[in-house]
Amino acid sequence: MAEATETALACIREEVERAFSSAPGAVLEAVLSRIAPADECARAAAYAAWDSIAHPLGGLGDFEDAVARIAAAQGSAEVAEFPRALAVFFSDNGVVAEGVSQSGQDVTRAVARNMCEGATSACRMAAFAGAEVVPVDVGMARGIEDARMVRANVRRGSGNIAHGPAMSRDGAVRAIEVGIAVACGLARAGVRLLAAGEMGIGNTTTSAAVAAVLIRADARSLVGRGAGLSDASLARKRDVVERAIDANSPDPADPIDVLSKVGGFDIAAMCGFYLGAAASKAPALLDGVISCTAALCAARLCPNALGYLVGTHASSEPASQELLRELGIKAPLDAGMHLGEGAGAMAYLPLLDSALRVYRDGKTFTATGMAAYEHFEAGK
């Protein structure tokens, strides 16, 4: 993988230390106050720049929208080459005790080791896309000793949501603040395009529970097979999600309550990551269903944060399309992916880079001596 630079790691660790030395909620409150709406003038200027390029109007479809979103997020239609990074949040979920996954928490630890070595699928894809990778322990049941892992553990694994809350409210806030710290640290180090991924056995169960509560949907319809389940195991997983919601009675109007009762430390940290990106005016690429669940939590805490998020792909998990609709964000890729770790965002990056090459270097209608296309309303 493209390992995080010492500068980036130092900045992240300083921000994490600052967060842990503050009272729970202080960092979150400060960041929420800094998030302004995305720059609509920059968005309009980006669309105007696209229209000036000698190609059919809107010819690159969703990629033109993505570049315009990036322009709005950074506050300028001059979208230069940007350093990019993928932060991957590791956490264990107590709900695995209910048999909702075919593997246990030892796999989280094994993947953490492999990621530090640059040996996971997402690491290979990030290297191809030119992105640094930052592994973060926010809630692993058993940590690993590796200098490349950011240690920001809030608690050694979450509780079993089938029988009680995943964590305390302060624990959820702390995890959100870890994500804020990571995003702000990367931005301080000069990273201008951010992405987040996750790894934690059982997190498609927790994300389905959080999503079901926030969008007030039938929980069973949002539960998928995760890393692979038999029909019987899928039925059990659906029952577990329903039981978790019934047992904890999370408040749909309070995202932190929902995260603390039926979520996970990884989802909470990713929520904070998107808030930190928005506060830093750095566009953030979404990933799959767990990422979108975290993004919805961020948007419910601060609607302005939505303007800094860029969709990449639709996961094969059932909740994915529902979450994207709720966010109002397009996902250009629909490849049936469900890998996690930020892999979908990394698959999208080279395609985005190719569109950006056209945006920056494409010849204009004026330069080619061609008449520019005009916009017409439908029916005219």
Tell me the role of every PLM-derived stretch.
Residues 2-380:
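N-terminal loops that bind phosphate or other acidic moieties
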